[in-house]
Amino acid sequence: MKKELTDRQKKILDFVLSYIDSHGYPPSIRDIARAFRITPRGAIVHLNALEKKGYLTRGKRARSIKVLNRSEAIRLPVVGTIAAGNAIEAIENPTEIIEVPKAMIKIGFDHFLLRVRGESMIEEHILDKDYVVIRKQNTANNGDIVAVLTNSNEATLKKIYIEPEKIILKPANSKMQPIELKPENVKILGKMVGVIRIYG
C-alpha cells in the first residue's frame, strides 16, 4: 500500500501528471522548481520522496520521470466554475467529464471537479482556469482549502479558519483580504484534494 502524500508532494505529483498530459513528456527538474518557486535541489528532494513512496520512478537522464499506475484514472464531472477571487458564481450543473489520477480519490467519498476563475489562490499554485478536485464533505479543519457556498448563493475557493463567532475565508494571495462571515452564512461543499492543469 502506498504511503500518504504531504500537500506539497501531492501538488508536485499533480503538476507532473498535468505536464505529461499536455506536453507528451515529463517535466524537467527546472520546470518543477520554476513552477513551485523552489530550488532544483528542493525539487529533487520532493521527487525522491515521491519515488520512495511508490508514486513514480526516475532515471539518470533528463526528463526521465515515470508516474506509476498511470492507467488508473477516475472520470469526474465538472459541475461548474468557482471563484478564486471575489465570490462570483454559484455551482452549476455538470458541463464536462475529465479523467483524474486515482491517487487523488479517497474511497468512500464522492468527488467532483470545479474550474477555477481568479487569482486569489496563486500562492498555493492554484491558477485561473485550473480544475480543482473536491472531495464532498461538510466539515473542514483550519487551514484546509475548501469550496464553500455563501448565503447569497455564491461559491468560492479559499483557506478556511473556523472561530466560535465567525468563519474566515482566507485567500492565498498577499494582495487580497480575507472574507469574514457568520457560521450560519457558510456552507462547506467539500475539501480540495488535487489540482488539474491543462496546458495549451
From Swiss-Prot:
Keywords of this entry: Autocatalytic cleavage, DNA damage, DNA repair, DNA replication, DNA-binding, Hydrolase, Repressor, SOS response, Transcription, Transcription regulation
Catalysed reactions, semicolon-separated: Hydrolysis of Ala-|-Gly bond in repressor LexA
GO biological process: DNA repair; DNA replication; negative regulation of DNA-templated transcription; proteolysis; SOS response
Site (Cleavage) location in chain: 84-85
Entry annotated with the keyword DNA damage: yes
Entry annotation: catalytic residues: 120 (for autocatalytic cleavage activity), 158 (for autocatalytic cleavage activity)
EC number: 3.4.21.88
Pfam families xref list: LexA_DNA_bind, Peptidase_S24
Cleaved signal peptide residues: none
Record feature DNA-binding region, as residue ranges: 29-48
S-S bridge residues: none
CDD domains named in the record: S24_LexA-like (cd06529)
Record text on subunit structure and interactions: Homodimer.
Entry function: Represses a number of genes involved in the response to DNA damage (SOS response), including recA and lexA. In the presence of single-stranded DNA, RecA interacts with LexA causing an autocatalytic cleavage which disrupts the DNA-binding part of LexA, leading to derepression of the SOS regulon and eventually DNA repair.
Protein name from the UniProt record: LexA repressor
Naturally occurring in which organism (per UniProt): Pseudothermotoga lettingae (strain ATCC BAA-301 / DSM 14385 / NBRC 107922 / TMO) (Thermotoga lettingae)
Name of the gene this protein is made from: lexA
